[in-house]
Swiss-Prot record:
Major subcellular site: nucleus
Protein localization: Nucleus; Cytoplasm
Protein name in UniProt: Armadillo repeat-containing protein 8
Disulfide bonds: none
Subunit structure of this chain's protein: Identified in the CTLH complex that contains at least MAEA, RMND5A (or alternatively its paralog RMND5B), GID8, WDR26, and RANBP9 and/or RANBP10; ARMC8 has an ancillary role in the complex.
Organism in which the protein naturally occurs: Danio rerio
Protein's job: Component of the CTLH E3 ubiquitin-protein ligase complex that mediates ubiquitination and subsequent proteasomal degradation of target proteins.
Gene from which the chain derives: armc8
Top-rank taxon, per record: Eukaryota
Length: 673
């Protein structure tokens, strides 16, 4: 019987709750304005801390009525203010609540309310707007829809500490793109917000600081302007340095360090400046220590990784600051063993941040080890480091996988590591698995790493070859992403270097001549350069040159002609002439050049070019064609003499460039022998 009674009981309780909520909404429609005001005040008291009540009132249609009352010119200022306060309270509920408020067009209504002159009403509207805008479900673009909004918000900054706090918080949350940065910059964000950094209110100082961190991120224009800003006679960078002092709240230290990091990365502060080397870097290393909260350690590590990414000196300094390399190993120890955690909340917290910690540690290791051999050695010798990277490659979190492969890529730049750690841990296996099915950003990093693993001195090259990687790499060359096409062809180029004939034939077969020639006309110069590099490596020993040219000679000569005639860089043309020199070294392949007078004229033209690199490559080509010890050399020498090549060679023996002069003399000796 109890089961039968339960349902009706539930319904009656629900009806009661709904009836109470309905009563609040009904009072908003009372014809007596005084009753309406009292109804709004009672509603305000009823919803404080009561998410269920908030949801009920939203479902029952309270929001459109509150917005109507807020916008009515006939409403008293007190009523309008109370409506804004209730809406602010409703917005502090769940994400669904905020979605409903946004759908009811709360944002334009509140922005309109800011045109009122009454400060208390303005503050109530701003407080609600702040809560709505900092929610992840609110489209930030809504702040920028009406072009008059940003300048009006700037003008309200001087009204009170509350307007300063709410407006800077809105800006800090809604500045997500370079376009947003530009809008705020153009409307005077820097000069309006800078004085707030010395406000007596901590909240105002903090939000102003956050504003500068999002404005300066990857923005040279903002960063260059910030360097010259004075706040109460003090340079802004020095204000940030003061905010990083150990006695300041961690949130402030971290955000100030971010501001200086972003200004440095944007080129506004030199990496060797004291405020970076002696202040920002040590502050960020401190943020990585065990004493800090997990989320602070994540932010500290990621910011530090970004700061030193392009600078080898900062990497070296960081690697010997506070045992950073071993300190980061601790990032992998979360969540702690379950038995040691009695607090379930703590376990939940650790689990939530474990992925982020691993991701941050991998990013920082990648940045630390991107240039210096000793640092890479230090990283790989850290406890279980290679095992951690390997397991990171197969984590469920895509961000951790990306950070792990980025770390692996950084370490793979080391010849020593490729020969030792990478081989010992068979890193190529999980890497190949990752390449089978991953988003493009992971594929780009994984294929870059694979390029390094396929270098001729890498012990991983052989097992990778045997695993059927050629087909995979050929498929990458057909990608829409130019970065993936570059990496696919680059890996094939490394694979073809000093490879045996079997591998070369397999590459040509798998790639297909059509695709090879498509890559030779790729709009991306990097793709073209690597494809030429592949071709040069394929055509590298006489039997290989003759075999490939016997089956694909016509198309290769055609491609060479097109490139030499086209609008290409010196590097591209030099690489193409080197391919021609390789063809000229073949036993039978050289006839493809000798029977092509048009090609010979092109070589002649490049021997007289203003660029020494092109002259060298073209002269090398002729040198190979007239080499004495080969069959038919006399006929070739005679033909080239008739075409005027000897006169050019003679002239080049007087060249100012010693290499060109030597190469021309070597060629001339073939005629004298």
């Amino acid at each position: 019987m109890a089961c039968l009674l339960e349902a009706p009981l539930r319904i009656s309780v629900l009806s009661e709750v709904t009836a109470t909520s309905r009563h609040y909404v009904d009072r908003l429609f009372d014809p007596d304005p005084q009753n309406v005001l009292q109804g709004v005040i009672d509603m305000k008291n009823a919803v404080i801390g009561n998410n269920k009540q908030k949801a009920n009132l939203i479902v029952l249609g309270a929001v459109p009525r509150l917005l109507y009352l807020l916008q009515q010119s006939s409403s008293t200022l007190e009523l309008r203010t109370e409506c804004a306060v209730v809406l602010g309270s409703l917005s502090m509920g769940t994400e669904n609540n905020i979605k409903s408020l946004v759908d009811c067009h709360i944002i334009p209504a509140l922005l309109q309310g800011l045109l009122c002159s009454d400060l208390i009403f303005i503050e109530a509207c701003l407080r609600c707007l702040r809560t709505v805008f900092i929610s992840p479900v609110t489209p930030v673009q809504l702040l920028y829809t009406d072009p008059t909004v940003i300048p009006h918000l700037m003008s309200l900054l001087s009204r009170s500490q509350h307007t300063q706090e709410y407006i800077t918080q809105i800006f800090a949350h809604c500045c997500k793109t370079p376009e947003h940065q530009t809008v705020l910059f153009n409307h005077g964000a820097i000069q309006n917000i800078a004085p707030l950094l010395i406000s007596p209110s901590y909240k105002v100082r903090m939000q102003a600081l956050k504003c500068f961190s999002v404005l300066a991120y990857e923005n040279a224009q903002v960063s260059m302007t910030l360097v010259n800003v004075l706040v109460d006679g003090e340079q802004l960078s020095q204000v940030f340095v003061r905010m990083m002092q150990r006695d300041k709240p961690i949130e402030m230290q971290l955000t100030a360090a971010k501001c200086l990091t972003y200004m440095c990365r944007a080129g506004a502060i030199r990496t060797e400046d004291n405020c970076i080397v002696l202040k920002t870097l040590p502050c960020l290393v401190r943020m990585c220590s065990k004493e800090r909260l997990l989320e602070e350690r994540v932010e500290g590590a990621e910011t530090l990784a970004y700061l030193m990414e392009p600078d080898i000196e900062l990497q070296r300094i960081a690697s010997v600051t506070d045992h950073l390399v071993s300190m980061l190993a601790d990032y992998f120890k979360y969540p702690s063993s379950v038995s040691a955690i009695t607090d379930i909340k703590r376990l939940d917290h650790d689990l939530k941040h474990a992925h982020e910690l691993r991701q941050a540690a991998f990013k920082l290791y990648a940045s630390l080890g991107s240039n210096d051999e000793d640092i890479r050695k230090k990283i790989t010798e850290t406890e279980n480091m290679m095992d951690r990277i390997v397991s990171g490659l197969s984590e469920s979190s895509i961000k951790v996988r990306l950070a792990a492969v980025r770390c692996l890529h950084s370490l793979s730049r080391s010849v020593q590591q490729l020969r030792t750690s990478f081989h010992d841990h068979a890193v190529w296996k999980p890497l190949m698995k990752l390449l089978q099915n991953a988003p493009d950003e992971v594929l780009v990093m994984a294929s870059s790493t694979l390029c390094n693993l396929l270098l001729e001195f890498s012990p991983s090259k052989e097992p990778i070859l045997e695993s059927g990687v050629i087909e995979l790499l050929c498929s990458l060359t057909q990608s829409d992403s130019s970065a993936l096409r570059v990496n696919g062809i680059w890996a094939l180029m490394n694979m073809a270097f000093q490879a045996d004939q079997k591998v070369k034939v397999e590459i040509v077969r798998a790639l297909g001549t059509e695709q090879l020639f498509r890559l030779l006309s790729d709009p991306d110069t990097n793709v073209l350069m690597k494809t030429l590099g592949l071709l040069r490596n394929l055509l590298s020993t006489r039997p290989h040159i003759d075999q490939i040219m016997s089956s694909h000679g016509k198309q290769i000569m055609q491609a060479v002609t097109l490139i030499l005639e086209g609008e290409h860089s010196i590097e591209v043309k030099e690489q193409t002439l080197c391919i021609l020199a390789n063809i000229a070294d073949g036993n039978t392949a050289k006839e493809l050049i000798m029977t092509d007078d048009d090609m010979l004229q092109k070589i002649k033209y490049y021997m007289g070019h203003s660029n020494v690199k092109l002259q060298l490559a073209a002269t090398f080509c002729i040198s190979n064609l007239i080499w004495n010890e080969e069959d038919g050399s006399q006929e070739r020498q005679d033909k080239l003499r008739e075409m005027g090549f000897v006169d050019i060679l003679h002239k080049l023996t007087q060249a100012s460039d010693p290499d060109l002069c030597d190469r021309a003399k070597t060629a001339m000796q073939q005629y004298l022998a």
